[in-house]
């Protein structure tokens, strides 16, 4: 995914000519990989921070397949590894393209919410395509009106979230609520935890 990461970050920088702090969650990047990323972004006002994640924190418990790698769960450790000066931030999957300025989006008022995200209204995450665990959890009385969001682009209220959530909390939800049988792994966990505190963009 290194190539995709470089393309995504280049599109971000091209359309947002300001200083950007980039935090990259990883467990296997080599010095050569890191240098390639830095070379790719050399002409932009970017500072790259590498946040190492221990793969063993997730391996052996969380569902993976050809589509869902273990790295998909790394965002569940963000609140544990980010420096204390980070108040809000975007989370981006690497398979996106930024095609315009994000200034207005970045400065949106959270109105007390943990997240700002976009509704996921296609694929397997809509009621008519729910699998058994989705039907059980998102079809429950508490969540049946929940508008499921896509976790590939998130504006995160880090200042608020770090006082309530951490890796252990999210993993507890994976175990106690989902029995590790998520259908859209980390995205299901985030939708369950933040279903009352996500503003749809």
Q: Where do the language-model regions lie?
A:
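Glycosyltransferase catalytic domains, chiefly GT-A lineage
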Residues: 1-200
